[in-house]
From Swiss-Prot:
Protein name: Gag polyprotein
Biological source species: Xenotropic MuLV-related virus (isolate VP35)
PANTHER family, A to Z: GAG_P30 DOMAIN-CONTAINING PROTEIN
Region listing for Disordered, in residue ranges: 139-218, 449-536
Lineage: Viruses, Riboviria, Pararnavirae, Artverviricota, Revtraviricetes
PTMs per UniProt: RNA-binding phosphoprotein p12 is phosphorylated on serine residues.
Length: 536
């Protein structure tokens, strides 16, 4: 019997349940169909060495991730959950992935390091993600140590230089490190101190922490914290509409930030305070509290359970522990649910019916606007198969008039899916005439209309002349007949009577004076005939 070849892509599909569980731990949701599409069709086109069958090489994954997270129109925010899940699979592989992960090569030899004191921490290394300060550049150059090939690649567009090997050859260096370690244990560092050196503790063995900042696992296996920069917050606020104006777009932005940055409780409050108004923030927090579920899996209103899952006051969650990270994952999920629920407006079907296709708008873009209106103004999910009929009817009736008429005349319309209707609408849209063709058609129609009007006027004129000619012919015929009778002798003579024939009843045997049919009695006055004068 033949053997089937197992690839990273086929392996993930065989263990799809584990993949979804790992994605859930990253606060994201992945679909099998898009998983296959991105792996086999999208990411190979980035030209970074990604094979169509997938790979668990962290170097290649990091390069794909940098393309996905690219800011501006060149980024791919819809692929963020999928590449983050791929990275989690490769960084902390489950048992069924470990045979496919190449072993990490031993680190390159470095200068001898003196044994640290009992309270000293290992020498720190620069972060692989950008720090917004340039104080490191003032240090003298040191021998460069290449990062582990299994770790993520460095973004060459950032301001931070690659990590340098630190040689603690002096006792003063050790004293400084001990003092820094003591300070980090006593009180949490300020954002600037966090940027310069981070707050680093060894992670748990079963940790699945994402590699995105503010919480990020460094190349040396130490957890680093990078707070939001003021420039990021400023750009997010000024380059996106407000929550009241377009809740869907701002919710998508915050969801992307929650996925990629893995923010702490304080970071979430800073993010909400920057992007939302006070009233919007209170509404989001209220809806998030309603989404908390109890031990039975149902929504709960118990204050202790709500405060434990979604606290309004600063909790004592330690993100360096597994328990603390689990609390943060649940908090971010509830916060996202609150954003989605608070962004829904009261049901208003009139708003949905008011969404019509623009003159030059493509059917696909119109469908996206229509679905967004369903999400915003109705409690229905347009992606739900049960709502496909309603969305299809709205798509037909609210399309452009020329497209809507042709869609209504399609054969077997009831069996058409929404995708079929969109494809037909795209065909109709692409066959539309250009403005020049439309002007030419209108000009021809006007000329044809004028030609028809002239022909109709000429036809009516000919009919009028024909009718006038017939009347004149009848009149002339009457005159001619009268003249002919006058020439033949004037009035016609009365027929001659027999000797015994009555002139009144034309019967024989009596005369007119004795005719029994002739009325008797006095003769009445003869009516006078009135003559018309020229004045009348």
């Amino acid at each position: 019997m033949g053997q089937t070849v197992t690839t990273p892509l086929s392996l993930t599909l065989q263990h799809w349940g584990d993949v979804q569980r790992i994605a859930s731990n990253q606060s994201v949701d992945v679909k099998k169909r898009r998983w296959v599409t991105f792996c086999s069709a999208e990411w190979p086109t980035f030209n970074v060495g990604w094979p169509q069958d997938g790979t668990f090489n962290l170097g290649v994954i990091s390069q794909v991730k940098s393309r996905v997270f690219c800011p501006g129109p060149h980024g791919h925010p819809d692929q963020v959950p999928y590449i983050v899940t791929w990275e989690a699979l490769a960084y902390d592989p489950p048992p069924w992935v470990k045979p496919f992960v190449s072993p990490k090569p031993p680190p390159l030899p470095t200068a001898p390091v003196l044994p640290p004191g009992p309270s000293a921490q290992p020498p720190s290394r620069s972060a692989l993600y950008p720090a917004l300060t340039l104080s490191i550049k003032s240090k003298p150059p040191k021998p460069q140590v290449l990062p582990d090939s299994g770790g993520p690649l460095i973004d060459l567009l950032t301001e931070d230089p690659p990590p340098y090997g630190v040689q603690p050859s002096s006792s003063a260096r050790e004293n400084n490190e001990e003092e820094a370690a003591t300070t980090s244990e006593v009180s949490p560092p300020s954002p600037m101190v966090s940027r310069l050196r981070g707050r680093r503790d060894p992670p748990a063995a079963d940790s699945t922490t994402s590699q995105a900042f503010p919480l990020r696992m460094g190349g040396d296996g130490q957890l680093q914290y990078w707070p939001f920069s003021s420039s990021d917050l400023y750009n997010w606020k000024n380059n996106n509409p407000s929550f009241s104006e377009d809740p869907g777009k701002l919710t998508a932005l915050i969801e992307s930030v929650l996925i990629t940055h893995q923010p702490t409780w304080d970071d979430c409050q800073q993010l909400l305070g920057t992007l939302l108004t006070g009233e919007e923030k209170q509404r989001v927090l209220l809806e998030a509290g309603k989404a908390v579920r109890g031990n039975d899996g149902r929504p709960t209103q118990l204050p202790n359970e709500v405060n434990a899952a979604f606290p309004l006051e600063r909790p004592d969650w330690d993100y360096t522990t597994t328990e603390g990270r689990n609390h943060l994952v649940l908090y971010r999920q509830l916060l996202l649910a609150g954003l989605q629920n608070a962004g829904r407006s009261p049901t208003n079907l009139a708003k949905v019916k008011g969404i019509t296709q623009g003159p030059n708008e493509s059917p696909s873009a119109f469908l996206e606007r229509l679905k967004e209106a369903y999400r915003r103004y109705t409690p229905y999910d347009p992606e739900d198969p049960g709502q496909e009929t309603n969305v299809s009817m709205s798509f037909i009736w609210q399309s452009a008039p020329d497209i809507g008429r042709k869609l209504e005349r399609l054969e077997d319309l009831k069996s058409k899916t929404l995708g079929d209707l969109v494809r037909e609408a795209e065909k109709i849209f692409n066959k539309r005439e250009t403005p020049e063709e439309r002007e030419e058609r209108i000009r021809r129609e006007i000329e044809e209309k004028e030609e028809r009007r002239r022909a109709e006027d000429e036809q009516r004129e000919r009919e009028r002349d024909r009718r006038r000619h017939r009347e004149m012919s009848k009149l002339l015929a009457t005159v001619v007949i009268g003249q002919r009778q006058d020439r033949q002798g004037g009035e016609r003579r009365r027929p001659q009577l027999d000797k015994d024939q009555c002139a009144y009843c034309k019967e024989k045997g009596h005369w007119a004076k004795d005719c029994p049919k002739k009325p008797r009695g006095p003769r009445g006055p003869r009516p006078q005939t009135s003559l018309l004068t020229l004045g009348d």
